[in-house]
Amino acid sequence: MTEMKILIVTLTYIEKSIIDEIVNNLSSYGLEVDILFDSRKYLPISAFNWERLQYDAEKVLSFLKSKYDFNYDSIIFLADSDGYIDGYNFVFGLTIDNFAIIFLNRLREEFYNRKPDLELFMKRVVKEVTHEAGHILGLGHCNTIGCVMNFSNTVEDVDKKQARFCKNCIYKIENLSKYLQRK
């Protein structure tokens, strides 16, 4: 589909099975994926909103962009935190330019006072990482039922979609890739 090198940076412990699923899913689209386990990095306290008890996603991403300078087309961060942007109660993830962050807290069943479910958590993480990778590839939100690029307002919305791009989104990615190769 497109030749792109993506670095996934885990800012928290993530089960290897989840990382493997992320790599397999993104690799199936021809993306080259590397993993960096970097629990030494922290989210900046200056980005934490004490009234909301959440991180300002834009401030966090700006901070992380300044700390990582690798030879990758894109970097996606995974943080075991809760994030928001102005105008929204929360976000599962945010992409700015070629950088994205996924906030994992609300993808866990425990957040909703339910029994932990590692398999369901893994599916949700893979979907949200793929969704943010889609934004990095130039896609907006999609209205095709089940497409990973559907906007998710709730965790139930995440559960309804697949971890795959629909045919229309794949077509858009392929055409954008061809256009960029001609430039």
Swiss-Prot record:
EC number: 3.4.-.-
GO molecular function: metallopeptidase activity; zinc ion binding
InterPro entries: MetalloPept_cat_dom_sf, Pept_M54_archaemetzincn, Pept_M54_archaemetzncn_arc/bac
Positions that bind Zn(2+) 1: 131, 135, 141
Gene3D superfamilies reported in the protein's UniProt record: Collagenase (Catalytic Domain)
Top-rank taxon: Archaea
Keyword terms: Hydrolase, Metal-binding, Metalloprotease, Protease, Zinc
List of catalytic residues: 132
Record-level GO BP terms: proteolysis
First-tier enzyme category under EC: hydrolase
Cofactor stoichiometry and binding remark: Binds 2 Zn(2+) ions per subunit. One is catalytic, whereas the other seems to have a structural role.
Subunit structure: Monomer.
Family the UniProt entry places it in: Belongs to the peptidase M54 family.
Protein name: Archaemetzincin
Organism: Saccharolobus islandicus (strain Y.N.15.51 / Yellowstone #2)
Taxonomic lineage: Archaea, Thermoproteota, Thermoprotei, Sulfolobales, Sulfolobaceae
Gene encoding the protein: amzA
